[in-house]
Amino acid sequence: PNIVGDLMLFKNEKRVFSTAKLHPGNGNSGLLVSEVKKQMKDNSNKDTAFAVIDGSPGIGCPVIASLSAVDMVLIVAEPSLSGFSDMERIIKTARNFETDIMLCVNKYDINAGITEQIKQMCEKEDILFAGCIPYDSSAIDAINKNKPFTH
């Protein structure tokens, strides 16, 4: 079989962190996401209250794999035409899974008009609006330096 990535598990008495690293040049069909979720479940305590799955951007198979068997999805939308379109599609997909939906807008201040459209759509569609995150160039600097944004 074609191995597209490596599973990694970090665990202590209180937390489990399951992730994977995709090998360069390989695509992710969603099977790797499913394996990451399975590894997390297999290594979590039975009394674990919740787990966070940080899904990939867009609306492809990995995102659909992230949505299976979850109670709630937090959609992080960006106020651009493509971001709005992706948001609409992921909302439709999440509704097919009958999961609760919450939404926030990342970089809300780069396009006030689309941000307002997103808020109005949330109200109209009865989606819990979680808030707005401003654009901050220091976030990009932190990513480029491989440092947490909180430092």
Locate predicted features.
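Amphipathic helical hotspot of TIR/SEFIR-family domains
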Residues: 85-95
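Inter-motif core of Ras-like GTPase G domains
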Residues: 60-81, 87
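Conserved strand-to-helix beginnings and helix N-cap segments that scaffold or border functional pockets
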Residues: 29-30, 63-64, 87-88, 115-116
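Cys/His-rich short segments
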Residues: 1-12
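Structural beta-sheet core signal
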Residues: 53, 75, 103-105
